UniProtKB/Swiss-Prot annotation:
Residues 13-24, 47-88 have a biased composition (Low complexity). Residues 1-12, 37-46 have a biased composition (Polar residues). It comes from Dictyostelium discoideum. Residues 1-88, 109-132 are annotated as: Disordered. This is Uncharacterized protein DDB_G0288467. It comes from the Eukaryota. The lineage of its organism: Eukaryota, Amoebozoa, Evosea, Eumycetozoa, Dictyostelia. SUPFAM superfamilies: beta-sandwich domain of Sec23/24.
Amino acid sequence: MRLPYSSSKPIPTNNNNNNNNTNNGISINKIPKSHYSYYQTQENNKPQQSQQHPLLQHQQQQQQQQQQQQQQQQQQQQQQQQQQPQQQPQIATITATISISPSINNIIVNNSPIKTPSKKHRSSSKKSPSSSKKLNKVLSCCFVCQSSISNPFIVKETPKANHYFCSIQCFAQASP
């Protein structure tokens, strides 16, 4: 429906930005209220979501299902990671419960040899006062190590039988 206007007069343009009641020079107030309210109710009665093509709806549903499946998989992976114990080596302080035996055959030099008397035919179960002194000296050298279950602390005799070195490198995980 066109609004009547005189063809001899040019259509006024809206050069005044402060006038909020005009649209392209035509005042909104000139539209009859009955028509305006009719258009307004038609706009309000429109459905909120435009109906999509069934193929588009199907694709969107598939995408949503895939996203949900991915989220579920991520949650399951996180739960599995939480359930599995961490298998990274832990740092443990060496304690005096470690027994030193000549049968242990690995050493890493810590730049500080410890001179101790050596007994070649000593069993690991017997502990003499000299072995406890030896243990204390070696422990004073080796302060922190990654401990293992079988050999928390690895030491061997050097070619010179009266020298021991402390080990800082260990090879397995800490015992629980």
